[in-house]
Swiss-Prot record:
It comes from the Bacteria. This is 7-cyano-7-deazaguanine synthase. The lineage of its organism: Bacteria, Pseudomonadati, Pseudomonadota, Gammaproteobacteria, Enterobacterales. Its EC number is 6.3.4.20. Belongs to the QueC family. The gene is queC.
């Protein structure tokens, strides 16, 4: 029986990963982290979406200790969330939560170890990403190697979206017939607004630009996505 663990926030990327995983694995376990994020709606949305899609199980872990160390506009009400133009002007935006993916992937691997899952799936990507160093392919591979050494188990970190742009990520959701579901039920917005979001923050801008790009040339984007992912 094939099992996997999806690092799940209830946003566009992790939901698309969950949709694909449900087609590929016998058991799909979601893990969501409460790290004191600015908008608790994220956790509620993640729980609702995983249930609607039919995940095998959904674990929510309290990692609020991260909030004590990682100062970010996603964890502090007194730090404003930058709009897209402000984010573009910074090498690492204030929305970056230092150590977040280090912690999340490590804990997800421990959970995978306990339930006998062969892999951990995460929706990080280098294309159209927000300048976060812990979304890079080299980081994920390096951490995967270190974690496997530490637990003496071969658990694979899988990044289905690593080389897809946002338009192609929308195409992947559409390939599985879930574009409208992802658009209306997920929460990607840094300001905590479900669906199409606030339209001002970097996350909303990338999401909307990707959707527009896909809808403008669906066939070409779909073909490009299939070639990258290896779908027919």
């Amino acid at each position: 029986m094939k099992k996997t663990v999806v690092v799940f926030s209830g946003g566009q990327d992790s939901t698309t990963c969950l949709i694909q995983a449900l087609e590929q694995y016998d058991e799909v376990h979601c893990i969501t982290f409460n790290y004191g994020q600015r908008h608790k709606e994220e956790i509620e949305v993640a729980q609702r979406v995983s249930q609607l899609l039919g995940a095998t199980a959904h674990k929510v872990l309290d990692v609020s200790l991260l909030n004590e160390l990682a100062i970010s506009s996603l964890t502090r009400d007194n730090i404003p969330v930058p709009d897209f133009k402000q984010s573009e002007q910074s090498d690492i935006p204030s929305t970056f939560v230092p150590g977040r993916n280090i912690l999340f992937l490590t804990l997800a691997a421990i959970y995978a170890y306990q339930i006998g899952a062969e892999s951990v799936i995460t929706g990080v990507c280098e294309t159209d990403f927000s300048g976060y160093p812990d979304c890079r392919d080299e980081f994920v591979k390096a951490l995967n190697h270190a974690v496997n050494l530490g637990i003496a188990r071969d658990i694979q970190f899988i990044t289905p979206l690593m080389w897809l742009d946002k338009a192609q990520t929308w195409a992947l959701a559409d390939y599985y017939g879930k574009l409208d579901f992802v658009r209306h039920n997920t929460l990607t917005c840094y300001n905590g607004i479900q669906g199409d979001g606030c339209g001002q923050c970097a996350a909303c801008h990338l999401r909307e630009r990707g959707l527009h790009g896909y809808l403008q040339d669906k066939n070409a984007v779909m073909d490009a996505m299939k070639n990258k992912v290896g779908l027919k």
